[in-house]
Amino acid sequence: MLYRRWGSDKDFVISYTSSNESDKEIVEEVKLTLKAHVIELYLSNYISKDTAKKIIRAINSFKDYPSSGYEDVHEALEDYIIKNIGEEGGWVGLGRSRNDHVATALRLRTREYIFDIMEELYLLRKSLIEQAKKNLNTIMPSYTHFQPAQPTTLAHYFMYLEEELNTPWEALFNSLKLINRSPLGSGAIVGSNVKIDRKREAELLGFDDVLYNTISSTSSRIDFINAISSLTLLMLVLSRFAEDMILLSSMFVNIIKLPDSHVSTSSLMPQKRNSVTMEILRTKVGECYGDLSSLMMIYKGLPSGYNLDLQEMNKHYWNCIKHVIPSIHITRDIIQNIQIKNFGEIQGLTATDLAEEMAISGIPYRKAYIDVANKIKAGTFVAGISYTKSIENKKVIGSPNPSLLTQEIEIKEKRLNNQHEKFKQYKESVIEKMGQLGVIEDGLLQQ
């Protein structure tokens, strides 16, 4: 044990407080963070070029993260460096704390995950728009209170989902910018006597800026909770979609046919088409909300400053995050392959059309409404309008009217393309800034 100079060195105590398992997620980010720190020590004239070179080479050669014997990856990495290059390796501890380094590594890893998720979310929204274009005239019933309401189209339903997913997109992009602030150089809580250029370190790691207050830098996890909250918004939309698919594909409703690849049969009952992927998706959403709840429950009672409780939050970040991309993939595949079945006359689906036509012709709407309701109750209602005509008559913005919906699709497609371009530019700026670290590292190692 490199750091444990007080307390027990018994294996069961060390393993109880160790973060080794969750640290496996951030090994590369911890190495990257330490390299930025070593480069900063060199650029600030605290260590020689030769020492910096030796340390960076040792960092790069750290491949096999031991599963035991250390409190965390930071201790394992520093011990590895010292064992490989001698006491000179101990310079990595100058102006550094695990508190600011783990916070930095967590932000780097989360940033990469958000990059990946937003790219997948873009593809999902793009698929919704593309499928909406193809299904402007694919008629289906809409539902309120899960009772048949009025005729609509599959395109209208797809554009509803696209609109719902716009909110998580905006929330995620905002979360990304909050995550992309650097804690590095904050020390344990109040900074360090070592005159580290925190802004230069931030630039090397692709951050937008530093997270200024050093108490916040080292002990705040509010930006991570915010990011997970944004992801649960996304998963919430997917969960409602999953519920729609389960209900609408059931034999009781039988409006939608799910792709064969997304259903399975029973081991006993050969007629079954169980919507298994949608059932699992609902479960993953529940797990994400459990993770968010755990994060808030851990965080709510902590005094300011770093507490080891914070390391127990890490596993909940990764658990939720790792459910998101597979859930998006499953959703996109269903959207691209869904089929609406032919369905017959649904009693009363155009009842509102008749009541509104009567009102437009001069009868007060409530009187027309009661008249139509009485006909439905007596079983004498006759639909005087086709589903297609009913949809065409809805000439209000946001309706399933094909002409208006085509205009909406064009507007939403332009919005999505603009959002994606803005996101790409942001991601490219991060990559470009991080290139400086590689240039400096290469320069050191080649000399």
From Swiss-Prot:
Coiled coil: none annotated. It catalyses: 2-(N(omega)-L-arginino)succinate = fumarate + L-arginine. It is found in: Cytoplasm. It comes from the Archaea. Pathway: Amino-acid biosynthesis; L-arginine biosynthesis; L-arginine from L-ornithine and carbamoyl phosphate: step 3/3. Keywords: Amino-acid biosynthesis, Arginine biosynthesis, Cytoplasm, Lyase. GO terms for biological process: arginine biosynthetic process via ornithine; L-arginine biosynthetic process. One of its GO terms (cellular component) is cytosol. Its main location: cytoplasm. InterPro entries: Argininosuccinate_lyase, Fumarase/histidase_N, Fumarate_lyase_fam, Fumarate_lyase_N, L-Aspartase-like. Its EC number is 4.3.2.1. GO terms for molecular function: argininosuccinate lyase activity. It holds the Pfam family Lyase_1. CDD domains: Argininosuccinate_lyase. Belongs to the lyase 1 family. Argininosuccinate lyase subfamily. This is Argininosuccinate lyase.
